[in-house]
A protein has these predicted regions:
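Catalytic beta-strand/loop cores that center a nucleophilic Ser/Cys/Thr
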Residues: 1-44, 59-61, 92, 154-215
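Short alpha-beta junction capping motif
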Residues: 41-55, 66, 72-75, 93-146
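A short, well-structured beta->alpha microelement
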Residues: 82-95, 348-351
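Activation corresponds to long, low-complexity, non-globular regions
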Residues: 165, 171-265, 406-424, 431-443
Length: 486
């Protein structure tokens, strides 16, 4: 399959994959060798190849890519000149071909998926292609359970994940030694002696994110361990394999649990923080304006592992979402975690629902273009310090002592999210809000553009995804800049 090939060109923006069974292996990788771009497997007497972008099978004109795919077809079919067909949701042409081409839009019934696995086991070959992140973006469906290719490939020990692949320069490279990049092999080594290469560790963590089946294998290795979540004092470094596996599995598993069974994550009491159980949880009535763009602050905080209840009392909740937490950056790609790598959660709203997360966070609502004004009650939360420059009724000297660990200062053009410790002794929040409003308006004046209708957001975080600060919504920076001096 790889004779005379050491790299292939980058076509489009491919996704990433995971591989974990003994008979499966990575074929092509990008910068991150733990997340292949193409994988293959032997299954019974047959073979299966998958690549995370359809451009490689859609009339490739590049000479190297064309040669590579020709050799892939020969390897998969085990024929020099294979007869090739297109996979459809039936078995009509299977006996007449050596190889079936499977595009991402061909969704198979469970009956045909079972028959396809048997056909491969008896000596058939399949080449599958999909852009997994693009498929999720277009369909809004679950990659692991709703994409037919992924359901079949899970039986072979490999699946698509949801990340983008980055090349090495303008190419992807042939995968390194399979023992390093096969998550199953790496997991067995971890189980035996607690060690693993950096590539292998990354492969295990990514496969655990991608595959519920593989996650069960990881749980059998780390479930008996009592582990602290990552904190500034006890970071989870790349060498801390078992800790990072625990974090990866916990971060995936909690989402499938009933709300009543969700517990706080170890370390969440440190960041983003919690509030003593003796402090009363409150209920608030809110009126939400659908014309307001972006996250709508509530001045409320959900503690880690506790349950928030929402009841819509007026209006249609369709098109509205509820967000828990402002620390939106994910850290899976970082070599060291000083907080949990993914701690915010967004859910679509219904007329009545409960929400809990292991980390909690400030509570926000967000409208869409199709949503309408609604009224609701929210309970199970604590109050957070919130200054709003347009709310003349705020008693700031009382507000700043609200018990939640995170606070917000809201101007017309900028909203700051900072630790509550940064505002406990702040006497003039209006001066802060006006200063940052001026920063935004002056920036827009200099650029010759209008001030955006949606206020910018600035969030201080324990650890961010890139650099010391980065742009986006919200703008992210280190928590040290919000630490009071003196």
């Amino acid at each position: 399959m790889l004779d005379g090939i050491d790299s292939i060109p980058i076509l489009g923006t491919p996704g990433t994959m995971a591989v974990w069974e003994e008979n499966a292996f990575p074929v092509i990788v990008g910068q991150n060798k733990s997340q292949p771009v193409a994988v293959a497997a032997e299954y019974g007497d047959g073979r299966f190849f998958a690549i995370a972008h359809g451009s490689y099978v859609a009339g490739v004109k590049d000479g190297t890519a064309s040669k590579f795919m020709t050799q892939v077809a020969q390897w998969v079919s085990q024929k020099e000149n294979p007869l090739i067909g297109t996979l459809k949701n039936n078995t009509k042409n299977w006996d007449d071909v050596d190889l079936l081409m499977w595009g991402q839009n061909m969704q198979l019934s469970s009956e045909i998926e079972t028959k396809l696995l048997k056909w491969i086991e008896d000596g058939g070959g399949v080449i599958a292609s999909a852009c997994p992140w693009g498929w999720v973006q277009v369909t809004g469906k679950n990659l692991q359970t709703d994409l037919s290719q992924n359901r079949v490939m899970a039986k072979l020990g490999m699946q698509y994940g949801g990340n983008y692949a980055r090349g090495v320069g303008d190419v992807f490279k042939i995968a390194p030694i399979a023992l390093e990049t096969n998550a199953g092999v790496a997991l067995r080594q971890i189980k035996e002696d607690g060690t693993c290469s950096i590539i292998g560790s990354g492969a295990v963590q990514y496969a655990a994110q991608v595959s519920p089946e593989f996650r069960e294998q990881v749980n059998s290795v780390v479930a008996s361990d009592v582990m602290q979540g990552p904190t500034k004092q006890h970071p989870a470094k790349i060498k801390d394999v078992r800790t990072r596996l625990f974090v990866t599995n916990f971060s995936a598993d909690w989402k499938s649990k009933p709300v009543a069974e969700i517990v706080s994550a170890n370390g969440s009491e440190i960041f983003p923080g919690t509030v003593d159980a003796k402090v009363p949880r409150v209920s608030e009535a809110l009126q939400l304006d659908s014309s307001v763009r972006g996250w709508q602050s509530t001045g409320l905080y959900l503690c880690p592992g506790e349950v928030l209840k929402v009841i819509v009392t007026e209006g249609d909740p369709n098109g509205w979402t509820l967000r828990i937490g402002c620390h939106k950056d994910t850290l899976w790609h970082k070599d060291k975690w000083t907080r949990w790598p993914e701690i915010t959660h967004v859910v679509s709203m219904k007329e009545e629902f409960d929400v809990a997360t292991p980390w909690g966070g400030l509570v926000y609502f967000e409208s869409s273009n199709n949503s309408t004004n609604i009224s609701l009650t929210i309970s199970g939360v604590v109050k957070a310090p919130l200054f709003d420059i347009e709310d003349a009724g705020i008693d700031w000297l009382v507000e700043r002592d609200n018990p939640a660990p995170w606070a917000e200062i809201k101007g017309k053009h900028m909203i700051l999210s900072v630790p509550s410790s940064a505002v406990r002794n702040l006497d003039n929040p209006e001066d802060v809000a006006r200063f940052w409003d001026t920063v935004v308006s002056s920036h827009c004046e200099l650029a010759g553009v209008k001030v955006p209708a949606r206020p910018e957001r600035f969030v201080a975080d324990r650890q961010i995804s890139a650099g010391y600060m980065h742009s986006g919504y919200p703008i992210m920076t280190g928590v040290d800049v919000a630490t009071p001096k003196g």
